[in-house]
Amino acid sequence: MGRRKIEIKAIKDDRNRSVTFLKRKGGLFKKAHELAVLCSVDVAVIIFGHNKKLYEFSSCDMRETLGRYQYYGPPHEHKGPEDFNGKRDDDDDEDETTPAPEEMQPTTQNPPAVVPAHIPSHPGFQHVNHAPSASPPISNGIPFDPRHGTPQPQGASRPSSRNHLRRVSSNLGPQQHHGTPPPPPQNGFAYIPNPSMYHPNANPNIAQQPRPPQFAHYGPQQPLPPHAIPPHPMPQPVPPHHQAPQHLPQHPHPLAQQTPAMGLSQPPHASIPQVAQPFLPEQGRNSIPPAFPTEQSQPPRPVSLPDVSSADQMVGPLKVETSPSPPHQRSLSSKSRSIFTPIDDRGSVLARHFGLGPPTCESPRTESADVKAEAKQNDSKEIKPPAQPVAPPPPPRTTADAARSQSAPDIKPPPRTNSGQLPSKRPQLKVQIPSENSDRGSATADSSSSTGNQTVTPAKANPDTNHSGVVLPPPSPSAGAILSAGATGPPNPFARPPPPGTASQNSNAYNSNNNIETPISALPSRFVSDALLPSPSSFFPEWGFGRSGPDTNMLPSPLTFPTPAVQTGPGFAREDEQEKKRKSPDSGPSIEGTAKKSKT
């Protein structure tokens, strides 16, 4: 029973057309693959669907195939629709493959219509000769041009780039992405995996080049940042933020120019610059090489130093105005530093660490900006918090310049004084080491003065400076510096296990051990002696949760129970019971299996 011959003409019904298209497209691709494998030839099939989607099959890299096509002379064999119009009596295989282009002919423009049938560009000449509507593909009839009208200048310039095959292929790539932005994922599968075999050097450029033109054409609302091409178009006030971190390492001075530009572009909103400028310098400090930070950190700061009262007056009326834009900028900054950005300014670790909790007169937005600024300056510079958040608008440049002379000396001393205060604690740690008794006394004095908590071990003095309830990972950058600067070094968290009650008993012996075994402090298993066993119980609550009563009561239990459970007899008894239980189910399933077999 032969298959019913269908009349080759345009299918009007959308459903039937889509089904036929899918089936015949699959058959065409399969035939192309078989032809490529059986005959060791390179086959490329490109289909421009009626839904503006691009379908393609290529036995090798599509760009390389198209590049080679340009160098070939006139095709040895060329067929178009007219070659098949009168030949409908051929065998079924040709029926299956060749009609596909003619089905698509009514749904798409003429050039794409025949493309699927053969190597994509062969029909190009045919259409240039016969179909007046296909005038665009004049440059060697490459089928990419008909798809998009805008980047035709590239098409015109393409012949000049024919000297290098790779450059030609790279030019074809962007246009392909231009014409059909939806299928890049499919293009990605077709292009990006294969190129690695052919020319890995050219392909990274090819992979990158399609995108910029795509956004250049589809996202024209972003002409300003030429190099910064964020994957999603955003309003123009924000791209400078994207652009700033990218250019900082190379062009530090443009950033300093950008920060005033942002302030001037939004003069009516006085407090928008407050958030914008702290944000830019923060990222500047991240990415600028160490030679430049002073240059850029200073210009924004003088703006923040002038009168606090005037800034407060302006913040009041402008709170409503700032609400739309600063949240967006804060979201950007929060992505850059997820740990330190506080949801509630009072609840942030840094707010407690630097004493930001009390000042409530300032608007919460400026405080959050301040907390973010200090989160970045945390490692090297700890500056008076209340001074920065209140940043009057940059337009009064004269005051900013006048303050600049003052700000440079004013701001730099505070970090020195703070760092001086911290080292004032550090020498105490150094003094503590030689004599154990003095070590105890100085530690307790230090910690009690800092937080009012009574601490016995010097290790606890350092966490307490961050307040007892503080989560430890965030302050680690600053606290780690303090710990490492002391002679006791980083092992403090690990090597100070004794609980508050037992530490007085074990103080001398334990400190001697600690001095010896500090480098191996990360291994609690070394402290398994009876005198030191309780140490982990104080170590965990102190380190993880801050010393509070319930924690110290709760945590020892998991520490004491698991070790006996594994070592004592009941553990083995339980294992034996489990083995017995395992045996009984094993016998059970066998019986059940036989029963099941008998049933079936």
From Swiss-Prot:
PTM notes: Phosphorylation during asexual development.
Residue spans of biased composition, Polar residues class: 151-160, 328-339, 453-468
Bias kind Pro residues: ranges: 222-242, 386-397, 490-501
Region listing for Disordered, in residue ranges: 71-518, 544-600
Gene Ontology CC terms, in alphabetical order: nucleus
Amino acid composition bias (Low complexity), ranges on this chain: 243-260, 440-452, 503-515
Keyword Repeat: no
Protein name: Transcription factor rlmA
Gene that encodes it: rlmA
